Every structure is written in structure tokens, then in C-alpha cells.
């Protein structure tokens, strides 16, 4: 069975896609959101990041050639966005999670002024 034929993988990818759409739909509204809306938006980002981290781990553990290609494309995309080509993606995910924690702290401290 191909990696992408798995019901679990397909469901994860569908959920990632839905979360991405929700995040992108509201990203430009973020500056005008109130405190609770901002916290909800950051929560969506956290869920998206967790799902992406899990999918990346699954891709990394798979022997499926298509999964390996997708993993390589993710690394290529990260490099095109300015990350060094030898970046450890798990470190990238961890750093992104820390950034989201900082955002939540800022929202709590400053209300809606983030």
C-alpha cells in the first residue's frame, strides 16, 4: 500500500488543508481581531503546526518513494524561504512552536495589541 493510500494519512492531509484554509482566510484580519479571536487564531496555528509535524515525521519514517519525494519538497520549500539547506526540520517545528507561545504570551499581556 502506498503511503498516500492510507486512510489515516489521507484524513491528516485533509485536516491540514482545512486548517491552512482557515488560517489563510483570517491572517489579514489578525491585526483587527480582539484578544479572544487572536488566541483562537494562534490556537489554530498550533493545531496546524502539530499536524504538520506529525505528517513530516510519518514521511520521514516511510520507505515509500512518494513519501520521500514529498519530504524532499518540504525541505526544498523551507530552503527557498531562507532556511539553511541542512536545517533539522524538527528544530524548525520546535522553534515555530516557541514563537506561537511568545505570541500567546504577548496577547495575554497586551490584550489585542499584537
Predicted regions and their residues:
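A broad "ordered helical/assembly scaffold" signature
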Residues: 2-7, 11, 39-40, 46-47, ...
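Generic structural concept
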Residues: 10-13, 17, 42-49, 75-78, ...
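Amphipathic alpha-helical interaction modules
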Residues: 25-70
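Amphipathic alpha-helical binding modules
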Residues: 72-114
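Short terminal alpha-helical segments
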Residues: 1-39
Amino acid at each position: 500500500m502506498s503511503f498516500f493510500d492510507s486512510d489515516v494519512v489521507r484524513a491528516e492531509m485533509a485536516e491540514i488543508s482545512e486548517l491552512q484554509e482557515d488560517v489563510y482566510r483570517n491572517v489579514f484580519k489578525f491585526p483587527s481581531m480582539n484578544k479572544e479571536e487572536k488566541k483562537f487564531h494562534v490556537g489554530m496555528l498550533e493545531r496546524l503546526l502539530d499536524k504538520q509535524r506529525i505528517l513530516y515525521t510519518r514521511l520521514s519514517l516511510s520507505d515509500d518513494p512518494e513519501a520521500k519525494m514529498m519530504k524532499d519538497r518540504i525541505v526544498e520549500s523551507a530552503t527557498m524561504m531562507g532556511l539553511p539547506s541542512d536545517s533539522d526540520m524538527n528544530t524548525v517545528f520546535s522553534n515555530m512552536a516557541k514563537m506561537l507561545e511568545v505570541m500567546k504570551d504577548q496577547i495575554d499581556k497586551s490584550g489585542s495589541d499584537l
